[in-house]
UniProtKB/Swiss-Prot annotation:
The protein's role, per its UniProt record: Methylates the class 1 translation termination release factors RF1/PrfA and RF2/PrfB on the glutamine residue of the universally conserved GGQ motif. Catalyzes the formation of N(7)-methylguanine at position 46 (m7G46) in tRNA.
The gene coding this protein: prmC/trmB
Segments for region (tRNA MTase): 305-518
Positions of region (tRNA (guanine-N(7)-)-methyltransferase): 301-518
Keywords: Methyltransferase, S-adenosyl-L-methionine, Transferase, tRNA processing
Record InterPro entries: DNA_methylase_N6_adenine_CS, HemK-like, N5-glutamine_MTase, PrmC_N, RF_methyltr_PrmC, SAM-dependent_MTases_sf, Small_mtfrase_dom, tRNA_(Gua-N-7)_MeTrfase_Trmb
Positions of region (HemK): 1-300
Protein name as it appears in the record: Bifunctional methyltransferase
Length: 518
């Protein structure tokens, strides 16, 4: 028996509609187009055209698969992504339109379009042809749609793509042939970074599995029953992949390299925190067409470039290991600081860190921020923190002025400046931590009634600082009759002990910020 295109489509539409398919008419036409190999326009115009028995039989078989909720992309074996068709099957995740935002972001970065307020596909790529070569790593390539789209859009790029699934790699390789990019891509069977040796990349990109197992009951039948779970679900409430990437990515990035990741629409805060904890900057979060957070742009804090690596004695292997592995977890950033609810104390120039780490140990409910340019002292703090399980601190191994803009006004409960370099010679005095301009800045960072503690074993310097404080007029000196009395929980540091041995007397000035408003 023969049926017309109209009859077949109407029948299919009714069946698909009954099981809740969102666009039954469109899907029916897609299936029929796949069977007849005729354009959609033909099926719309020639509604009375009769179909052959072979075409009807083939269509019914495909329709039965769709009525079992098998995704239409798996039935046809094709899915469009970034205006190109990609081969797909049950071994790879079906490309989603939301992931196209990731492509937009990478293109924008590569062509120096860093201010992507809205993501839109680039139609003219003449400017791309003149850019520098970019070496890109994609983790978990699946069908290869991300890597191949980037290669097609950006002629001066090459890609190494990894995947743990051998079957997925077969699909990706088929797509590289389909889109003629085999000479610019290497696909490696690897679990994340395992088989990458010591290669370095300008960009690391990934759409990793990020769905929590607890969300399975909420997912569409098409997804949960047919798409590969290894590409969908992750442990740690869907965040496992981000932890793996954060832990390992730095060693594979070139200087100034970046990481571009797709994220779940409600995961931005948690993913940001993971990367902040590992010593990265969050450069930008991009939204999809539904205004959901979808793609995150990340760059590592590069200690060799961004931080003053001053070293007193040569660093031991243990110290270097602490700086490499532990310091990123405790690096100060304004993002970490923004949501802080605890009392906050800042110590400027903490030396070897004895006072700093002791204060943190005694006051576990207070956050201590330490500024110190000498990495020997930074490493010493990290060592003692690990030994005593102290975690209520952040470190800024750089010059003080570089952190001040990121400290909000009225945010600090106290500031310690203990035994700073006195810079005795007049022409060097402008280098002192406490000068007129910097004192004005620091007082604004203090809460009203917050404390500033200053100590020195150089008598002239101490009394010159008292004069500076009195000229400022916004501090009250506590215990001005007894400058020998230190503040609470003070311990004698190695430097202080050295001063005692050399017959120099340490004096302490405890100040209370007395300004009634900023």
């Amino acid at each position: 028996m023969q049926y017309s295109i109209k009859q077949i489509l109407n029948n299919a539409n009714d069946k698909l509609n009954k099981i809740g398919i969102n666009l039954p008419e469109l899907e029916a036409r897609i299936l029929l187009q796949h069977v007849t190999n005729k354009p959609i326009e033909h099926l719309l115009i020639k509604l009375n055209e009769q179909l052959s028995e072979a075409e009807i039989e083939a269509f019914e078989k495909l329709l039965e698969r769709r009525l079992e909720h098998e995704p239409i992309a798996y039935i046809t074996g094709i899915k469009e992504f970034y205006s190109r068709e990609f081969i797909v099957n049950k071994h790879v995740l079906i490309p989603r339109i939301d992931t196209e935002i990731l492509i937009d972001v990478v293109i924008g970065l590569v062509v120096s379009r860093n201010d992507l307020n809205t993501c839109s596909k680039l139609k003219s790529l003449d400017s791309v042809k003149t850019i520098q070569h970019y070496n890109i790593l994609e983790l978990g390539t699946g069908s290869g749609c991300i890597a191949i789209s980037l290669l097609c859009e950006l002629p001066n790029t090459s890609v190494i793509a990894t995947d743990i699934s051998v079957d997925a790699i077969k699909v990706a390789k088929s797509n590289t042939i389909k889109h003629n990019v085999t000479d610019r891509i290497q696909i490696i069977h690897s679990n994340w970074f395992e088989k990458l040796n010591k290669q370095k990349f300008d960009l690391i990109v990934s759409n990793p599995p990020y769905i929590s197992h607890s969300e399975k009951l909420e997912m569409a039948i098409e997804t949960i029953n047919y798409e590969p779970h290894i590409a969908l679900f992750a442990e740690e409430d869907g965040l496992e992949a981000y932890s793996i990437i954060a832990k390992n990515a730095k060693q594979f990035l070139k200087p100034n390299g970046k990481i571009i990741l797709e994220i779940g629409f409600s995961q931005a805060e948690k993913v940001c925190q993971i990367f902040l904890n590992y010593g990265y900057n969050i450069d930008h979060i991009y939204q999809d067409l539904q205004s959901h957070n979808r793609v995150i742009e990340i760059s590592p804090i590069n200690l060799n470039r961004s931080y003053a690596r001053r070293i007193g004695k040569s660093l031991s292997k243990m110290q270097q290991k602490l700086l490499d592995n532990e310091l990123p977890k405790y690096l100060f950033s304004k993002e970490k600081f923004a949501s802080e609810k605890r009392k906050i104390f800042l110590e400027i120039g903490f030396g070897m860190g004895e006072h700093f780490i002791n204060q943190a140990k005694i006051n576990p409910d207070t956050l201590f921020i330490g500024v110190e340019v000498y990495l020997n002292g930074v490493a010493n703090v990290l060592k003692h923190a690990a030994q005593h399980n102290i975690m209520n601190f952040l470190l800024f191994p750089n010059n003080l002025d570089l952190i001040l803009n990121d400290l909000p006004n009225n945010s600090l409960d106290g500031i310690y400046i203990l035994f700073p370099d006195p810079w005795i010679k007049n022409k060097k005095k402008k280098k002192r931590i406490l000068n007129k301009e910097r004192l004005n800045i620091l007082q604004n960072k203090l809460k009203n009634n917050g404390n500033l503690v200053f100590a020195s074993d150089i008598e002239n310097y101490f009394y010159e600082t008292i004069t500076l404080i009195r000229q400022n007029g916004n501090f009250e000196i506590i215990h001005n009759d007894d400058y020998l009395k230190p503040h609470d929980n003070y311990i004698i540091t190695k430097y202080h002990q050295k001063a005692i041995n050399e017959n120099r007397t340490a004096k302490f000035m405890i100040l209370q910020h007395a300004l009634t408003g900023h």
